[in-house]
A protein has these predicted regions:
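Conserved S-adenosyl-L-methionine
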Residues: 163-168, 187
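C-terminal hydrophobic helical "lid"/dimerization subdomain
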Residues: 212, 241, 285-335
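Glycine-rich beta-strand-centered segment in the early N-terminal region that forms part
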Residues: 18-35, 49-93, 113
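N-terminal Rossmann-fold NAD(P) dinucleotide-binding loop
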Residues: 154-155
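Conserved acidic E/D residue at the C-terminus of a beta-strand in Rossmann-like folds
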Residues: 173
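Rossmann-fold dehydrogenase core element
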Residues: 249-255, 265-304
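Glycine-rich cofactor phosphate-binding loops and adjacent beta1-alpha1 units
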Residues: 140, 188-276
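NAD(P)H dinucleotide-binding glycine-rich loop of Rossmann-like/cofactor-binding domains
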Residues: 89-148
Length: 335
């Protein structure tokens, strides 16, 4: 079968690899759509987290963990699944024509709701990640929530907030393209951090908060989501520091991004403000299922987020496109 394998930074090649064999109870999927995740980009761009890929014979690693497909073979029986079913699932190695679902993971094969495309279903995993971040924040109606980083995770958090709460939403990014998508999805306010100081803007929008023993004026957002992280080549104030400064006393900061280097932080401000800091990693299976239900019900529309699709043979071009924040939101590979 064909697969796109990673061999080093900026080096993804398509070639022939062995088609997965099946043990008793295993399910074989014909992959129909696979998204390129931010974690894939950390590997592709800088060689970080290389062990996330699945090794292949030629020495490369097949990435891709957010995908959908069609059941084409079952060795024996798998509860609730039959050949021909349209399903979405998770695992490592989705940048390939076929994917083996081990018997113990067949419970993670969820049927794609009628009327939902393979492409939309392939965005279920990142939506579940966004949902988990929002669940950690436990938003209450009437609050102000700030999302820094309007990639697939930040925009997903916006969609979850709009679908399930009545909070005021402010989205911050440097990409006009992504901010336009945020407005399309219902963001109450968008801020281009490349043209105006996001902290100053949040202070204007939420009102200033003067903290004793602290020399800076801070914002009063109830929750701030750091969906940007810290790239290796970034030299400004870390987004996490901005988030801490934007948040009100006893507010919440949810970190749902990967840091490519350690940030320099003013921890005293975190301590003085009594902020609750959450690390948000992945999701529970119930959240994964709920994310697909949100898509299937129409409460969340993922189509505006899918900006590019590429055949498997152009996987390298797909990865390069996903790096271009001004052009792309979610890039899918269609094996």
């Amino acid at each position: 079968m064909k697969a796109a394998a990673y061999y080093g930074p900026r080096d993804v090649r398509v070639g022939e690899v062995a088609k997965p064999g099946l043990e008793r109870g295993d399910v074989l999927l014909r992959v129909r759509a696979c998204g390129i995740c931010g974690s894939d980009l950390h590997t592709y761009r800088h060689g970080l987290f290389e062990d996330l890929g699945v090794p292949v014979e030629a020495g490369g690693r097949v990435m891709g963990h957010e995908f959908s497909g069609e059941v084409v073979e079952i060795n024996g029986e798998a509860a609730g699944v039959k050949v021909g079913d349209r399903v979405c699932t998770v695992g490592m190695g989705g940048n390939a024509e076929y994917y083996r679902v081990p018997a113990m993971m067949s419970v993670a094969l969820l049927p794609i709701p009628e009327g939902i495309s393979f492409e939309e279903a392939a965005t279920t995993e990142p939506l579940a990640t966004s949902l988990h971040a929002v669940n950690l924040a436990a938003p209450a109606d009437g609050e102000t929530h700030v999302i820094i980083g309007a990639g697939i995770i930040g925009l997903g958090a916006l969609q979850v907030l709009k679908a399930t709460t009545s909070v005021r939403t402010i989205v911050v990014d440097i990409s006009d393209r992504r901010l336009e998508v945020a407005r399309q999805l219902g963001a109450d306010v968008t801020v281009n951090a490349g043209r105006e100081d996001p902290l100053q803007k949040i202070v204007e929008l939420t009102g200033p908060e003067h903290m004793s023993f602290m020399p800076v004026m801070t914002g009063r957002a109830d929750t701030v989501y750091d969906c940007a992280g810290l790239p290796l080549d970034y030299t400004g104030t870390p987004v996490l520091q901005q988030a801490i400064t934007m948040t009100k006393e006893n507010g919440k900061v949810v970190v749902v991004s990967i840091f490519e280097k350690p940030p320099e932080l003013e921890i005293n401000l975190l301590v003085r403000k009594g902020i609750t800091l959450y690390g948000s990693w992945a999701w529970s299976f119930d959240e994964f299922r709920h994310a697909l239900e949100l898509i299937g019900s129409g409460k969340v529309d993922r189509k505006p987020l899918i900006t590019h699709t590429f055949p498997l043979d152009r996987a390298s071009e797909a990865y390069e496109t996903q790096l271009k924040a001004e052009e792309a939101v979610k890039v899918l590979i269609l094996p």
